[in-house]
Each structure stands twice: as structure tokens, then as C-alpha cells.
């Protein structure tokens, strides 16, 4: 029992220490120009505020919002993480907490089918940009998405952009990663994603 108590305290300390310099953002205290386009991604170290861009990628944003409103992303792993480059999540089939399939994670589907790539509108993939992931083929976007942690100009016209992080990017920079692999064992998870206005 004593060992368990020490372990629990140690785990709590590590989590608190990991998030020590991350400012937690309260979206209710921020005035947004277009609050209907704001999604709040909650992770271990706090809130990440995403502004969605339906005029740039209407189909992609619609799919994302549909999944957010159904709470499909809750407790889904950040299964692919490249330090200082990107975090990827959204495998609804093989990435759910308590039911992860490490052999298949990253290949799962939402059950809604794929959608077409939206890559014709100009978009600068600056740090914090949010986009839908796909296979090596275009028009295979579904539920998985990624957020870049640095500027990625070569992603323009390659991936469907759906928005950009406007607050809280620091919380994503604390997501667990592995030095020798892009795919993470015992990963961090999305707690919830909610639209600011339902």
C-alpha cells in the first residue's frame, strides 16, 4: 500500500512538473470574432483553442465538427508524435483508451467513409496549423488529424487544412513522444474536444 501511495504521488508529481510552465487557457474569458468556429481541445496540460476555417475546407471542417459533436474524439490517443514537428490523433477504430491496437493504430476508420482532399485554396502551413491526415493517396481523409509544431511550407497543396491553434500550443508541445519511433507506446490522449458554441 505504501509503495502504491508513493507511486501515485510520483506519477502526480511528474504530471504536474511536465505541465509546470504551460498556461491553462479558459476559452470563456476570450472574445472571439467567430465563436461558432472555435473548438476546444483538452489534453493533459490544458486547453488548446482551435479556430476552424470552413471557407477554406468546408467538407473537412464539417467532418471534424460532426465527430466533435458526437464526442468521437474523447479518449483517443495521440498515436503519432514527432518532437517539435507534429502531433497526430483521431484513429477512432484502433486508438481508443483501453482498446488500443498497436499493430493497427493509424489505419483505423470512423465508419463515415472517406472525404475528398481540399487542397486548392491557398493556405500557409504555419506553426499551429491543423489538417486532416490521409493515406499516400489523395481523397482518403476521414477522422485523423494532425497539428504542426513548426512551419511546414511543403504541406501546402498536400494536406487538407481545417484550422489553426490560436491559444495553447504549448500544451501540445508536452505530448509524449519516443526518440526512436514516430508511433508512441502508452501514449497521451485527447481528453475531450468540444465546440465553444454547440
Give residue ranges: language-model regions.
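Cyclophilin-like peptidyl-prolyl cis-trans isomerases
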Residues: 1-198
Amino acid at each position: 500500500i505504501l509503495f502504491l501511495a508513493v507511486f501515485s504521488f510520483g506519477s502526480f508529481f511528474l504530471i504536474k512538473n511536465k505541465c509546470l510552465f504551460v498556461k491553462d487557457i479558459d476559452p470563456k474569458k476570450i472574445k472571439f470574432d467567430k465563436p461558432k468556429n472555435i473548438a476546444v481541445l483538452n489534453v493533459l496540460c490544458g486547453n488548446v483553442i482551435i479556430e476552424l476555417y470552413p471557407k477554406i475546407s468546408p467538407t473537412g471542417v464539417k467532418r471534424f465538427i460532426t465527430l466533435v459533436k458526437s464526442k468521437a474524439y474523447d479518449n483517443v490517443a495521440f498515436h503519432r508524435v514527432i518532437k517539435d514537428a507534429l502531433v497526430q490523433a483521431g484513429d477512432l477504430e484502433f486508438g481508443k483508451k483501453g482498446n488500443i491496437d498497436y499493430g493497427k493504430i493509424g489505419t483505423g476508420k470512423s465508419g463515415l467513409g472517406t472525404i475528398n482532399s481540399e487542397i486548392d485554396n491557398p493556405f500557409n502551413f504555419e506553426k499551429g496549423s491543423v489538417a486532416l491526415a490521409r493515406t499516400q493517396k489523395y481523397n482518403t481523409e476521414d477522422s485523423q488529424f494532425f497539428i504542426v509544431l513548426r512551419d511546414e511550407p511543403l504541406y501546402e497543396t498536400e494536406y487538407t487544412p481545417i484550422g489553426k491553434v490560436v491559444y495553447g500550443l504549448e500544451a501540445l508541445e508536452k505530448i509524449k513522444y519516443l526518440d526512436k519511433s514516430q508511433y508512441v507506446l502508452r501514449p497521451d490522449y485527447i481528453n475531450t474536444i468540444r465546440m465553444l458554441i454547440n
